[in-house]
Amino acid sequence: MSRYKKDNDGVTFLLVCIDIYSRRLFVKTLKSKKGQEVAEALQDVFKEIGVTPMTIYSDDGKEFYNSHVKELLAKNFVNLFSPKSEIKCAIVERANRTLKTRLAKYMTQKYNRRYVDVLQQVVNGINNSVNRGIGKKPVDVERGDFSTPMPVDSVKIKFRVGDHVRIAAKRGQFDKGYEQGWTTEVYMSNSTTTPTAHAPSEESIINGKSIPQPMLAGAIFGVIFGIFCLILHVCLVRYLVKARAKHIPKVRKVKAKKGKKDKKLKESKKSDDTSTGASTGSSIAM
């Protein structure tokens, strides 16, 4: 929202928080991403909720990992986690889309770009709308409404310990389908945890040889894993091109030889010169 800050008293960012249980939205305005300002906004969110949360999930930005926020969370006994995957915080990202859509409709209707005056009204409207994920309004959700948790062992274990795997690479919306969709690095599954996740090993054993593994933080869920069996047949395309280039015959450049056409052109030029000279002399004599 930085492009609208001139019309909204310098408000550049919006701190969006969502309660995963009730899907209730809490939004605070920020003029910068400084740690002190973010910590104060989080404190206001805690007061609005009424209780401090047990866990906070966020990205690994410096606006959350600084001394001010760390002190606030330690004071309220709150744990902060940040996923290392590209896919993270999907619930709040979807909430951002809903919030931006409603703000854009309001600004289009009013023919201006000022939204701070009605921001909390828009948030209140979202909280009073039925959420498709839970089938209820977030403001109507009470503790105990969803007493049946998801089964822990609902995901089947796809890989065994010792399997060599690759990680699925992030794909864009317009990426070509024939391009490689997996990382070049190969990992070996070392252990399986509950809920189902696979921890990578520090080294991989291929044909009895110990090969160091690339550094990888955290555990990997089976959803982004792909089995990799033909390890010995992997090679980069550029090496194949060089190997093939040795057998390609070189194309020799052949200079064009002077043929009969060139001689005829020279003879025609000489004849033209003599004819023009003769005609010129005859005209002077007369």
From Swiss-Prot:
Domain Integrase catalytic: 1-146
Protein name from the UniProt record: Putative uncharacterized transposon-derived protein F54H12.3
Annotated GO MF terms: nucleic acid binding
The species this protein was found in: Caenorhabditis elegans
PROSITE patterns membership: INTEGRASE (PS50994)
GO biological process: DNA integration
PANTHER family found in the cross-reference section: CHROMO DOMAIN-CONTAINING PROTEIN, INTEGRASE CORE DOMAIN CONTAINING PROTEIN
Comp. bias regions, Basic residues: 252-263
Matching InterPro entries: Integrase_cat-core (IPR001584), RNaseH-like_sf (IPR012337), RNaseH_sf (IPR036397)
Disordered: region residues: 252-286
Biased composition (Low complexity): 274-286
Compositional bias per record (Basic and acidic residues), positions renumbered to this chain: 264-273
Gene3D superfamilies in UniProt: Ribonuclease H-like superfamily/Ribonuclease H (3.30.420.10)
